Swiss-Prot record:
Keywords: Antiport, Cell inner membrane, Cell membrane, Ion transport, Membrane, Sodium, Sodium transport, Transmembrane, Transmembrane helix, Transport. The gene is nhaD. Belongs to the NhaD Na(+)/H(+) (TC 2.A.62) antiporter family. The chain crosses the membrane at residues 10-30, 34-54, 63-83, 98-118, 136-156, 221-241, 260-280, 282-302, 349-369, 386-406, 416-436, 456-476. The keyword Cell inner membrane applies. One of its GO terms (biological process) is sodium ion transport. GO terms for molecular function: antiporter activity. Pfam families: CitMHS (PF03600). Changing G330S: Shows an altered activity profile in both pH and substrate concentration. It is found in: Cell inner membrane. This is Na(+)/H(+) antiporter NhaD. GO terms for cellular component: plasma membrane. It comes from the Bacteria. InterPro entries: Cit_transptr-like_dom, NhaD-like. It comes from Alkalimonas amylolytica.
Amino acid sequence: MQSLRCVSWLAGLLCLLFSTPVFAASAAPLDLTSSLVGFVCIAIFVVAYVLVMGEEKLHMRKSKPVLVAAGLIWILIGWVYISRDIPDVTEAAFRHNLLEFAELMLFLLVAMTYINALEERRLFDALRAWMIRKGFSYQNLFWITGFLSFFISPIADNLTTALLMCAVVMKVAEGDKRFINLCCVNIVIAANAGGAFSPFGDITTLMVWQAGLVRIDEFLVLFFPALVNYLIPAAVMSFFVEKRQPSAVYEDVELKRGALRILTLFLLTVATAVLCHSLLHLPPVLGMMMGLGYLQFFGYFLRMTLPGSLARKRAMAEREGDQEKLKRLGGVVPFDVFSRVSRAEWDTLLFFYGIVMCVGGLGFLGYLGLMSDLLYEGWNPTSANILLGVISAVIDNIPVMFAVLAMQPEMSHGHWLLITLTAGVGGSLLSIGSAAGVALMGQARGYYTFFGHLKWAPVIFIGYIASIAVHLWLNADLFHIYD
């Protein structure tokens, strides 16, 4: 009896939700922005995102709340439309958003697999060991890790780059909290800035490229604005770096077999994706998935030739009496592509799914249209894009960029590049504003903190504004100023 009362209560609640006059039967999407179900969906998304922002405190993966929120939002939407006997409209909208996610997810999965393969082959360890052996001063280390972050992130993505450079700093300056915090702030700014002028540097730039709004070569016009965004705060912070030499640490790292060839295959994969998109007008994910095939064939080659390679190396080590090398050879395991796939950042990919589906659902309800009218018609696009860059420091740049793409505002090419820049570098204003910042707070826990980053926010903001000014000046013709 109690369960029947619960069912009756739930049915009554659903009737209340779906009985407002706005739900008139129509083949077109309904405007639900003023309905109770619309407000409930907004509340669900807000609660989910508050939980995401509290990831560090709650020790809860950020994908969990948005996955549940996405399900609840689309279930509510589905109930609305099926009550009006037009379920096909909801199904088509859901499949459209799912397809957008699937293309981006597969693209990112291949990129992450290659990065994990290069990490397993010890390419990044070798780079770190080289920097450590050189015995650079703190000043040199500050600038080298910053510039390497800026130039590696367009290829290896800003998150991977930041983690690599932070590992170098933590190894060399072990225990020096002040210097580690300064370097981590510098690395986050540099990695985010470097990722802004490449479709492979950040998820947001990849989204813009996949949407066909910016060609791959056109991202390069953001190079100088991004460089300014990095250099201004770096120059100021460098005055606070002590001019002394850390103790030299020797670390010998030997590249595993095939490391450089996998790097070559990664570059070939990127080239394949670019050619598919630019010459054949096919989604870039086709080229990336083909590139995963390159890696699988090479993995097969490595496994088939492993016994012969080990025999040659073992014979050489025995002739030289190198017991350490013989010990290492005894622990060699075959290269496995699928183990690299399994090590992809699945929490990030699932978080991305949740965000895409949540924002897609809110857009289907009509809220993105309202936001577009408020931002891009109530304001001019330049002001709107600058504001959205600042907002991305608080609520992450992925939902911000996806919302803008879903709004499809009428903007010049220069304005699309502007939102690409601001969403990419705006996250540097706070440590929680980018994946790189959040990751380093975990990797350098106790050294790099929210407030340690926050005290540099004013000078970072100056770099943010300066980069926008440089873009508006250098790329003025893209804004149709002289039309």
